[in-house]
């Protein structure tokens, strides 16, 4: 029973300290990609920001399990390329 309680507490902690979203560069633009070649590139970019994984979705890198400190789209900055 203690193991089940510890498991649920751990799962709640993961939910509190991680988020999902489109990865944003310092200029406010999303990391772009192509679906054919983008998954491995996006996975690497997302993991560089401590995400659990990433993939190319709608021509931008979508990350799962990002720390709360990492900016995601829509960011407060407008995209200035």
Curated annotation (Swiss-Prot):
Pfam families: Toxin_3 (PF00537). Disulfide bonds join 29-79, 33-56, 42-61, 46-63. It is found in: Secreted. Residues 19-80 form the LCN-type CS-alpha/beta domain. One of its GO terms (cellular component) is extracellular region. Its main location: secreted. One of its GO terms (biological process) is defense response. InterPro entries: LCN-type_CS_alpha_beta_dom, Scorpion_toxin-like, Scorpion_toxin-like_sf, Scorpion_toxinL, Scorpion_toxinL/defensin. Expressed by the venom gland. Keywords: Disulfide bond, Ion channel impairing toxin, Neurotoxin, Secreted, Signal, Toxin, Voltage-gated sodium channel impairing toxin. GO terms for molecular function: sodium channel inhibitor activity; toxin activity. It comes from the Eukaryota. Residues 1-18 form the signal peptide. Has the structural arrangement of an alpha-helix connected to antiparallel beta-sheets by disulfide bonds (CS-alpha/beta). Binds voltage-independently at site-4 of sodium channels (Nav) and shift the voltage of activation toward more negative potentials thereby affecting sodium channel activation and promoting spontaneous and repetitive firing. Belongs to the long (4 C-C) scorpion toxin superfamily. Sodium channel inhibitor family. Beta subfamily. This is Neurotoxin LmNaTx11.6.
């Amino acid at each position: 029973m203690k193991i089940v309680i510890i498991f649920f507490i751990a799962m709640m902690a993961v939910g509190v300290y991680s988020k999902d979203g489109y990865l944003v560069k310092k200029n406010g633009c999303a990391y772009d990609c192509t679906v054919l070649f983008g998954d491995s590139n996006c996975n690497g970019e997302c993991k560089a920001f401590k995400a659990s994984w990433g993939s190319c979705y709608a021509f931008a890198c979508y990350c799962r399990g990002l720390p709360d400190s990492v900016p995601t789209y829509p960011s407060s900055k407008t995209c200035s390329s």
